[in-house]
Amino acid sequence: MRKMLSVMVVFALAFNFLAADNVRKNKTEPAPSITTPQNIENNSRTEDWILYMIDSYGDGWNGASVDLLVNGTVVLDDQTVTGSEGTVYFSVDEGDIIETVWTSGSYDNECAYGIYNHYGELQASAGTEDNPTYEIYLIASFPVLVFFSEYAEGTSNNKYLEIYNNTGADLDLSAYSLSSCSNGCDETGEFDYPDNVTFDAGTIVAAGDVYVVHHPDADAAITAEGDQTHQYLSNGDDAYALTLAGATADAYTIVDIIGDMGDDPGAGWPVAGVDDGTKEHTLVRKGSVVHGNDGDWASSAGVTEDGSEWIVLEQNDWT
């Protein structure tokens, strides 16, 4: 069960705003749209981010260029594309202000660019229908690298939640808590039991290690790897979230969640195309996941095996 996940960050950037058939199109066709993801919780560290530039016609930016500034200082000057795409890297700290300045060329409608974070996730874009100004202003926000790596809803009391520390350093878990709802949430978007499970100051999880919260009467194979007990874990239809400590019913920060904060789903929520995946199954986070879902359970659960962050195992499979 204690998998000691070895998460490797692979820059498999989803350059979804330039499909293959967008190259060599008519010069009057606008660049495709980009959906900008929501910023997420900060952590203290420096990261390398990416400026990714495209030309939908494939003949370069024809005199256009972009400058990128961090906290008012130009760090990338006169960046341009000579073919269909270009990639450059720059460093940011949490809270840095990132701005771009655009210089027009002959065919701006061919041009678009996006800023990706350290994990290949699109943070902002320009030169699209959503942002036709060709300029970006955003504040660098880093994900919290702590998340649920396993969840088990087994027979009888064989239940646990496993929390993984992917920060690269020792983590004091007292900064976090588990907040939950029972049989759906009484009020949509509000926790029935905020700060339901808390952690004593000095509860240290080593880098790359996990912390297991389990039912006190769970199987010996679970308790042998356990760190803390909790009587009321999920029966399949009870949402559990990793939150920042100090959560209240309607004021909280979700780092990761299993289940959603709406009505009772019935037996459980579907996961990876498996009906009632949170009921009578073990869920294991894929090794490609490096941070929590920030409360977006639907995207995390997915509707297909490939489109989910989770691997669904049979009940009582926690080997």
How would you label these PLM feature ranges?
Residues M1-P32, T36-P37:
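Bacterial Sec-dependent N-terminal signal peptides
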Residues N22-P143, L313-T319:
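Primarily marks secretory-pathway-exposed extracellular/lumenal segments that are disulfide-
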Residues D93-D96, Y134-F142, V213, G268-V290, ...:
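Short, surface-exposed secondary-structure junctions/capping segments
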Residues Y113, A224-G226, D294-D296:
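A short secondary-structure junction signal
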